[in-house]
């Protein structure tokens, strides 16, 4: 602690002792009948409200006692404690009272701390209360944060009691929003009916009073988006819909319209936010070239493709700003969290002593940003995957005595935090391999391995082995080998099987024979532990990176997003998107010359809302 800080702390401690002993106190604040002896100078130093009160020439300047109306005594006591000691013990029970008192006394620093506390501790049980509290107080930033939170988590908010305690006009305004993150309109109808039935306390006539607002609230529900069976079931379960003529008419008209042609699309209604989410192919970690816009830079945006609609969109690249210099691997967890790994950019690397594997996650709620999760001991040519709450770094090359050697090391990290921990190693050293998550297990295949376990051998042998990791036993098992030894292939899980596409390889075990670019598709069935041939690719192709996939599965179909044709000239990407329908067993080109960059690092599939992504540039410049 420096001398200046120590001096200030000593002064506060002495003033606080004098306040407790009522020495040299020159004013007594009274709130709710409780008296608080204080020093005018201290009050004026922390509160512009008191400074004006004690210097404006009015009677408070000379009065010994000042009564503060509409000021809770517990909140005032805590604010005085903060003035004299800097201690401010915020809790869920006292934070709103303290923030109101700080707002009235113009103590902006305390008010800001209260807002930060409420934002940090916001959840589905209190966000509605915080929103209306902040709106009534005029705290716009807090109100905006709370409103975004409750809209994003509206499905969970509906399960709580806060939403049932709203006034009719408040609920109606909330249900009018297009921005509610609900996947089905049935949940909106359900919360309306629960609100009508809700009777707080022992108020027997409350349900009748609430039923008067039912026609008005039903008009906020987008009934054409509700299934006809659900509409009929709701009418059977809720007599309030039957006894009110207007409600009955609204429901019968909705059922009749839906029954006329159940296959017809609903009449034009704007979908709510959560209804627009869709599975997207994300080509993450792009290079800068390939897309030029006159006014907007797409260098730091990554290409996305929506197979169901054919739309092209762009997501912020993890290379944006000073994040990752390049992306080496990525995975989408079972909870739809987009995680990538790689190295820091040059500017950040200059400020760090050690080079590490850096892990970043896409922040969907703060769209356009990536947040740092963890750092692991450096390796390259590894695979990244996830099971449950854990990330896994598998194999690759690690530094040993100033040289990089292929390793069998596997490390695990919990998304809840903590250190990286070693787990069961691979049965052999492996690099440039592929990993697939399926049915709660990890499958590692292909890649390159040393000729023997001697660390000075060249890593010039490709692998055709398939390894399975069981997290319950923490063991690796070797399964049936592939027909081809290979690397630079893509591997995905589809319909309970593993599809391995293309790559560079040779037939059988690699003993140094000729290698060539493959158009082969191999399919593994885990139930019978056997491989079968799949429909060959239209031409031999390679992934864009040595160990990262360029394929993904959406709605039961397999997609390949950009690739290199053949091994001779793989410096130019073919920007086509291939599709395989496993039932038809035929490859088709669904997008030619897609608006993607000249290269990217890894293809992932995630469920995202197009509203949070960028559209293609309207001012595209031909290169």
UniProtKB/Swiss-Prot annotation:
InterPro entries the UniProt entry points to: BACK, BTB-kelch_protein, BTB/POZ_dom, Kelch-typ_b-propeller, Kelch_1, SKP1/BTB/POZ_sf
GO terms assigned for molecular function: ubiquitin-like ligase-substrate adaptor activity
Kelch repeat start-end pairs: 390-440, 441-496, 498-551, 557-607
Record GO biological process: proteasome-mediated ubiquitin-dependent protein catabolic process
BACK domain location: 127-236
Domain BTB stretches: 25-92
Record-given protein name: Kelch repeat and BTB domain-containing protein 12
Flavoprotein listed as a keyword: no
The encoding gene: kbtbd12
CDD domains: BACK_KBTBD12
Keyword terms: Kelch repeat, Repeat
Gene Ontology cellular-component terms listed: Cul3-RING ubiquitin ligase complex; cytoplasm
Disulfide-bond pairs as recorded: none
């Amino acid at each position: 602690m420096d001398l200046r800080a120590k001096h200030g702390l000593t002064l506060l401690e002495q003033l606080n002792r004098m306040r407790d002993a009522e020495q040299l106190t020159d004013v007594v604040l009274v709130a709710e009948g409780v008296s608080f002896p204080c020093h005018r100078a201290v009050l004026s130093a922390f509160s512009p409200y008191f400074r004006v009160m004690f210097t404006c020439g009015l009677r408070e300047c000379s009065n010994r006692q000042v009564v503060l109306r509409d000021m809770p005594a517990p909140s005032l006591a805590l604010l005085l404690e903060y003035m004299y000691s800097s201690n401010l013990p915020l809790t869920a029970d006292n934070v709103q009272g303290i923030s109101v008192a700080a707002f009235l006394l113009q103590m902006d620093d305390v008010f800001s701390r209260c807002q930060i506390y409420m934002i940090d501790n916001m959840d589905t049980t209190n966000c509605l209360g915080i929103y209306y509290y902040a709106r009534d107080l005029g705290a716009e930033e807090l109100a905006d944060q709370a409103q975004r939170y409750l809209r994003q988590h509206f499905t969970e908010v509906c399960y709580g009691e806060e939403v049932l305690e709203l006034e009719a006009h408040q609920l109606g305004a909330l249900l009018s929003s297009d921005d509610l993150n609900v996947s089905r309109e049935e949940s909106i109808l359900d919360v309306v009916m629960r609100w009508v039935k809700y009777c707080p306390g022992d108020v027997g006539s409350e349900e009748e009073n609430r039923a008067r607002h039912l026609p008005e609230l039903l008009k906020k529900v987008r009934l054409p988006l509700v299934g006809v069976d659900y509409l009929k079931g709701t009418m059977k379960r809720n007599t309030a819909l039957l006894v009110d003529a207007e409600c009955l008419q609204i429901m019968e008209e909705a059922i009749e319209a839906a029954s006329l042609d159940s296959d017809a699309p609903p009449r034009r209604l704007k979908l709510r936010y959560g209804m627009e989410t869709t599975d997207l192919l994300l080509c993450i970690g792009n290079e800068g070239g390939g897309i030029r816009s006159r006014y907007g830079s797409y260098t730091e945006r990554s290409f996305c493709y929506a197979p169901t609609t054919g739309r092209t969109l762009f997501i912020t690249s993890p290379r944006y700003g000073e994040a990752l210099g390049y992306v080496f691997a990525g995975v989408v967890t079972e909870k739809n969290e987009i995680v990538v790994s790689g190295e820091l950019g040059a500017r950040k690397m200059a400020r760090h002593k050690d080079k590490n594997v850096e892990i970043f996650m896409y922040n969907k709620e703060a769209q356009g940003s990536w947040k740092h999760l963890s750092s692991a001991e450096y390796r390259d040519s590894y695979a990244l995957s996830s099971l449950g709450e854990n990330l896994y770094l598998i194999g690759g090359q690690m530094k040993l005595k100033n040289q990089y050697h292929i390793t069998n090391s596997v490390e695990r990290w919990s998304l809840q935090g903590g250190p990286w921990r070693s787990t069961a190693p691979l049965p052999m050293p492996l690099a440039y391999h592929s990993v697939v998550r399926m049915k709660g297990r990890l499958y590692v295949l292909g890649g390159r391995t040393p000729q023997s376990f001697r660390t000075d051998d060249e890593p010039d042998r490709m692998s055709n082995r398939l390894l399975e990791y069981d997290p319950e036993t923490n063991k690796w098992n070797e399964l049936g080998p592939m027909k081809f030894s290979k690397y630079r292939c893509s591997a995905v899980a589809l319909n309970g099987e593993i599809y391995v596409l293309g790559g560079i390889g040779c037939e059988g075990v690699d003993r140094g024979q000729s290698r060539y670019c493959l158009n082969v598709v191999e399919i593994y069935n885990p139930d019978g532990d056997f491989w079968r041939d799949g429909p060959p690719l239209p031409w031999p192709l390679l992934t864009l990176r040595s160990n990262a996939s360029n394929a993904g599965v959406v709605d039961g179909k397999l997609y390949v997003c950009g690739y290199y044709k053949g091994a001779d000239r793989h410096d130019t990407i073919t920007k086509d998107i291939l599709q395989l329908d496993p039932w038809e067993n035929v490859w088709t080109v669904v997008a030619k010359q897609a608006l993607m960059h000249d290269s990217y690092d890894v293809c992932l599939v995630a469920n995202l809302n197009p509203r949070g992504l960028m559209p293609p540039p309207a001012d595209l410049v031909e290169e």
